[in-house]
Amino acid sequence: MNKDIIIGIDAGTSLIKAVAFTTNGRELGISSTPNEYTIKSDGKATQSLELTWKNCCKVIKDLGNQFNNFEKRVCLISVTGQGDGTWLIDKNGEPVCDAWLWLDSRSSDIAKKLTNLESEEMRFIATGTGMFSGQQSSQLLFMETHHRETLDKAKTAFHCKDWIYYKLTGIKATDPSESCFTFGNFRTQEY
């Protein structure tokens, strides 16, 4: 059996999609399902890690049902997902709390204070990005002050796509562009 199918997964905030391609890039099939998130008046915007994973499994299964011998034909899975946010797991790989999404604004005061520091220009030059409340840096600082018990339980901070990759492989990893986005130098890819 030839391994002739590439799967692309996009774990978006409101929709999760999976697309099957040939190894030459021709689209073969697609599946999608809505993804749920919660927004509160205090700026809270969260999403269940478990539900996001369950929805990813659903779209992969639905996609697989479109092909014969799907499992044996897949040669590659690529994962992308919503940017920024904070997806925390404990030492056993279990979610500590719902993910703080990129549109969560609870840490906006912290982001504003960080933006006004003298070191902001140096940080911007290194990271190539402006500071905002949806980034892990400001969210983790907010948690340190207001949700210490949650942060104390956490062993790993992921972004959405890293969570999906972890669930697919059991490996805790990210790509250099993601890890350097708010905490490192994107030019040198150093953390």
Segments and roles (model prediction):
Residues 29, 115-117, 172:
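Short, compositionally biased low-complexity segments
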Residues 104:
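Carbohydrate-associated surface elements
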Residues 1-97, 153:
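N-terminal glycine/serine-rich phosphate-binding loop of ATP-dependent small-molecule kinases
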Residues 91-95, 113, 117-122:
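Hydrophobic or amphipathic alpha-helical targeting/insertion segments
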Residues 11-13, 123-191:
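Gly/Ser/Thr-rich active-site cleft segment
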Residues 65-69, 116, 145, 149:
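Secondary-structure boundary motif
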Residues 67-101, 127-134, 165-185:
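Short beta-strand-loop/turn "lid" adjacent to the catalytic site in phosphate-handling enzymes
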Residues 110:
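Active-site metal-coordination/substrate-binding segment of hydrolases
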